[in-house]
């Protein structure tokens, strides 16, 4: 089953692209079919239907119902990337 993931940042360009590429590679390496949607943080609600995970590189102080939310800055900084990858895999494989 294809997993639908929203990757959001402030402008839907630079940091969300980096995070999306990391997530795409992670999923390919673990044979997880994925559909990635890049958007701005303020557009997340537009794309939430059927989503399995939301990853933001900007600070978000709210929840999105039952959809898990992870902070994607480790994909940008490189600090804590393995822990984030493990968390994403746990969510998507669960």
Swiss-Prot record:
Gene from which the chain derives: gatB
Protein name listed in UniProt: PTS system galactitol-specific EIIB component
Function recorded in the entry: The phosphoenolpyruvate-dependent sugar phosphotransferase system (PTS), a major carbohydrate active transport system, catalyzes the phosphorylation of incoming sugar substrates concomitant with their translocation across the cell membrane. The enzyme II complex composed of GatA, GatB and GatC is involved in galactitol transport. It can also use D-glucitol.
Species this protein is from: Escherichia coli (strain K12)
Entry text on domains: The EIIB domain is phosphorylated by phospho-EIIA on a cysteinyl or histidyl residue, depending on the transported sugar. Then, it transfers the phosphoryl group to the sugar substrate concomitantly with the sugar uptake processed by the EIIC domain.
The keyword Phosphoprotein belongs to this UniProt entry's keyword annotation: yes
Induction text: Constitutively expressed.
UniProt cross-references to InterPro entries, sorted A to Z: PTS_EIIB-like_sf (IPR036095), PTS_EIIB_2 (IPR013011), PTS_EIIB_2/3 (IPR003501)
Compartments reported by the entry: Cytoplasm
PTS EIIB type-2 domain location: 1-94
